[in-house]
Design a protein with these regions (language model features):
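Catalytic core of non-heme Fe(II) oxygenases with the double-stranded beta-helix
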Residues: 1-95
Length: 95
């Protein structure tokens, strides 16, 4: 496993990507736990998940957890208008 704490300051974002690297396929599953107790829609910072036939937008509400396969779903963090906090982790396979 691998985990980190992320703080996106106002004006931050993260471009569309996969969590599994081209040269390292050890990340099997991704998990994001949101830590934003006072989040409101105007705060932005939603997770945008690109499914094969539709796009899903997930609000970073406190206590909400998102879990997905690291090599299948591209995703991005939309522009934040307020600080956005989360713990992100990856369940890994192999050595």
């Amino acid at each position: 496993y691998e985990f980190h704490y992320a703080l996106y300051e106002k004006g931050s974002f993260y471009k569309r990507h996969l969590d599994q690297f081209r040269n390292d396929n050890s990340r099997a599953f991704s998990m994001i736990m949101y830590l934003n107790s006072d989040w409101q829609a105007k705060d932005g910072g939603e997770l945008c998940v690109y499914h094969p036939h539709h796009v899903q937008t997930i609000a970073p509400r406190n206590g909400q957890c998102v879990f997905f396969k690291s090599d299948e779903l591209e995703h991005e963090v939309l522009l934040t208008q307020a600080p956005r906090m989360s713990i992100t982790g990856w369940l890994k396979v192999g050595g």
